[in-house]
């Protein structure tokens, strides 16, 4: 009986164990099923604020390494997303956002540009202010507007983008500079070009600034009136264009490649005569109506050029050359390629970009190319002390051999029967193909721009900045005009020219910025010092009378030594400045800005070395008043009044000095050159005043 009870007890225990095992397995399986059912596949599209899809945006499950990227249409699909999870959306140059899934299988995202703060904070020179707190006239070119502009220069980015700014392309040659004017001209004799400042470096006058890769630019501010530009003194007399280049975003490492092809074409075809007979008939008729002898009569004119008769053109004359098709390209192409790498952590950041640009001119054999790199490095030594360094290298080549004489008479052939170039006379200097293949005009350019700076946050309200900037530029122009086909070359039996120009610019600046709030009062102040040194040198060697033209100007010794010309020039100038600015705001409604700068320039005589440039501006944010807000009409209503004095030192470094001149005299069968005080080339002007 006891054995039976024990057996029954054992069987009951086994049943209990089996039931427990079953329940355990079932609960585990159920948990797995439940866990699987709590994860879903999420799809969606990622766009920017303009509604354009973002290619390569990163979508990641928060708290995990699981993620994906968007395709060419901005679409993405991500599996195993927790129903209550959070997705992180990020993109280079954009603000990252987080979106809760909340069981949704479709999650779309819109990312805003990380540089959108630039629309709110405006760089004004040696500092920045909120856009709403501006008292001077400043135009901002939005960052999103820059990326779609196929321009190869800083000036090109501004064309049509800022009110009051004119960008005039005076030449269609590739690589040619532009004329930039802000609110028109300010001087009859001096410079009218605005100053361009790149990352705090007053780099030079606008117009031919090719060293900066446009893909590196993230914002541009244009200081237009005297109150805004007075902080730059005489250098800002014609306005200031402030350029800010790209910096790495903390916590990211990015590699990007951009290639842009641009095709150009004439807005309208040239209206040229295609029918030589009709052209000749109308020409004769016009000359007769003007009281002149008809030209197309089957005879030579006074210059010895033969013009066939109308009958000859109708019967035996077969030439109808389309010179425009031999001179112009059908569709010139420009190619812009940029590769950039950037990375940043809490202490160190760097951005390196390399660029190569080629541009075909509208004329055949008229080309421009440039290449270089831009390196920016920043390192925080201590929590309140940062050093920065940058270096830009630019190499350029310009070939200016094309063009000329697309208007050449279509009755003239390109070649003679023996393959030589057809010339109407021995003095025919307008054959475009002959000139293109024998003339030489090439320019090589080199620029190096280096900057170093430190920034010390002394206290939360006070920041001290000091920076050194150096620019070196050099260009070499090679020209050769052959003995045939060019007038200068014919008259001088071949002419070779080698021209070299070299310039150096050094700028040292130290300034302090202070800001503080006291209740409804907000005060900002800046005080600084600047020293600038500039030097220019050129030299030219010209040789004439080449016995052998095989090497052109590569063998200048082949020219007759008696006809060689050597010339050179040199100039140097200095500028010492002190500047200060005060910004005051009361109750976020009433604003005051006062600026003062003193410039001491070596270009002026001893009696007027210094120029003083004060400015002031007041502003009223009317939309912040309660009675205006009640109207519910204005998002922003602001009144502004400004006044300032600016001066211009865009004159020759030695214009105010008496200068020795040269003269030639004949002595003992030869011409001699004399130089001395008896031959002044310019009168002194020690009392010359600033403009």
Residue ranges with predicted function:
Residues 1-374, 386-388, 392-394, 449, ...:
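Short, small/polar-rich motifs associated with maturation and membrane association
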Residues 44, 182, 199-201, 375, ...:
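Short, well-ordered amphipathic alpha-helices
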Residues 132, 250-323, 331, 361-368, ...:
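Surface-exposed loop/interface segments of Gram-negative outer-membrane beta-barrel transport/assembly proteins
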Residues 217, 373-375, 466, 508, ...:
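Extended, hydrophobic alpha-helical segments in both membrane/secreted and soluble proteins
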Residues 245, 339-343, 373-379, 450-456, ...:
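Residues on the lipid-exposed face of transmembrane beta-strands in outer-membrane beta-barrel proteins
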Residues 455, 459-460, 691:
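Long hydrophobic segments that form regular secondary structure
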């Amino acid at each position: 009986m006891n054995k039976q009870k024990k057996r029954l007890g054992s069987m009951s225990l086994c049943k209990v164990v089996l039931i427990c095992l079953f329940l355990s397995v079932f609960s585990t399986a159920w948990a797995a099923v439940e866990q699987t059912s709590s994860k879903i596949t999420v799809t969606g599209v990622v766009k920017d604020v303009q509604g354009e899809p973002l290619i390569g945006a990163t979508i990641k499950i928060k708290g995990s390494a699981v993620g994906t990227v968007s395709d060419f249409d901005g679409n993405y699909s991500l599996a195993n997303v927790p129903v209550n999870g959070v997705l992180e959306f990020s993109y280079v140059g954009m603000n990252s956002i987080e979106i809760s899934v909340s069981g949704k299988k479709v999650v779309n995202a819109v990312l805003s540009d990380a540089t959108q703060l630039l629309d709110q904070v405006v760089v004004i020179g040696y500092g920045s202010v909120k856009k709403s707190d501006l008292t001077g006239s400043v135009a901002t070119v939005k960052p999103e507007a820059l990326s779609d502009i196929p321009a190869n220069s800083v000036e090109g980015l501004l064309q049509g983008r800022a009110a009051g700014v004119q960008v005039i392309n005076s030449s269609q040659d590739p690589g040619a500079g532009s004329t930039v004017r802000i609110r028109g001209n300010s001087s009859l004799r001096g410079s009218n070009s605005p100053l361009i400042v790149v990352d705090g470096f007053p780099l030079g006058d606008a117009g031919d600034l090719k060293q900066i890769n446009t893909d590196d630019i993230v914002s541009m501010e244009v200081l237009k009136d005297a109150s805004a530009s007075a902080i730059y003194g005489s250098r800002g007399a014609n306005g200031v264009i402030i350029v800010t280049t790209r910096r790495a975003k903390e916590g990211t490492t990015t590699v990007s490649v951009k290639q842009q092809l641009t095709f150009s074409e004439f807005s309208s075809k040239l209206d040229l005569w295609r029918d030589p007979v009709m052209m000749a008939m109308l020409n004769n008729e016009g000359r007769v109506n003007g009281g002149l002898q008809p030209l197309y009569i089957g005879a030579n004119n006074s210059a010895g050029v033969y013009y066939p008769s109308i009958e000859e053109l109708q019967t035996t004359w077969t030439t109808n050359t389309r010179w425009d098709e031999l001179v112009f390209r059908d569709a010139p192409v420009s190619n812009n390629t940029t590769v950039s790498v950037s990375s940043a952590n809490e202490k160190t950041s760097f951005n390196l970009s390399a660029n190569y640009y080629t541009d075909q001119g509208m004329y055949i054999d008229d080309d421009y190319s440039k290449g270089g790199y831009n390196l920016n490095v920043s390192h925080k030594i201590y929590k309140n002390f940062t050093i920065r360094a940058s270096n830009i290298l630019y190499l350029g080549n310009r070939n200016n051999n094309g063009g000329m004489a697309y208007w050449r008479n279509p009755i003239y052939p390109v070649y003679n029967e023996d393959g030589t170039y057809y010339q109407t006379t021995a003095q025919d200097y307008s054959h475009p193909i002959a000139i293109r293949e024998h003339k030489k005009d090439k320019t090589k350019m080199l620029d190096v721009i280096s900057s170093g700076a430190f920034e010390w946050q002394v206290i939360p309200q006070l920041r001290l900045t000091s920076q050194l900037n150096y620019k070196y530029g050099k260009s070499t122009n090679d020209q050769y005009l052959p003995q045939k086909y060019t007038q200068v070359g014919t008259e001088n039996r071949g002419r070779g020219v080698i021209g070299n120009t070299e310039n150096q610019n050094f700028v040292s600046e130290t300034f302090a910025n202070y800001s503080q709030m006291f209740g409804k009062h907000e005060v900002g102040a800046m005080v600084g010092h600047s020293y600038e040194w500039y030097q220019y040198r050129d030299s030219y060697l010209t040789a004439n009378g080449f016995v052998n033209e095989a090497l052109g100007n590569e063998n200048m010794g082949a020219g007759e030594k008696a006809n060689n010309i050597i010339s050179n020039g040199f100039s140097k100038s200095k500028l010492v400045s002190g500047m200060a600015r005060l910004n005051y705001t009361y109750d976020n409604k009433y604003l005051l800005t006062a600026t003062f700068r003193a410039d001491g320039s070596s270009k002026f005589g001893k009696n007027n070395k210094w120029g003083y440039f004060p400015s002031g501006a007041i502003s009223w944010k009317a939309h912040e008043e309660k009675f205006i807000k009640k109207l519910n009409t204005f998002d922003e209503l602001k009144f502004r009044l400004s006044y300032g004095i600016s001066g211009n030192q865009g004159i020759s470094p030695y214009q105010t000095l008496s200068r020795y001149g040269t003269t030639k005299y004949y002595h003992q069968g030869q011409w001699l050159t004399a130089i001395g005080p008896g031959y002044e080339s310019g009168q002194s002007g020690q009392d010359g005043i600033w403009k």
